Amino acid sequence: MLCAVYKSRKKAETYLFIERREDFSRVPEVLMSTFGRPELVLMTKLDPAKPLGLASTERVMSALKSQGFYRLHTTWKLI
């Protein structure tokens, strides 16, 4: 499964995975307004056998199939 990954210019460390590049039709308007103008970071092929760095590949794939997008917000803590 291919997907496009965008980062938010409004919210630091916030990413949006969608099924097709530039197709935000299944992303709720309220999410798009808080996300801001998306910036393409990566096009990738999702494979359950290959882990993603910050999210469960299976969870991302499931969300893409069911709702058309997956939002990821990361927080980094220095120890």
Model-derived features: where do they sit?
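Extreme N-terminal starter segment of soluble prokaryotic enzymes
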Residues: 1-2
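Amphipathic alpha-helical transducer elements in NTP-driven molecular machines
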Residues: 21-24, 37, 54
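Acidic, aromatic-enriched beta-alpha/helix-loop junctions
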Residues: 29-52
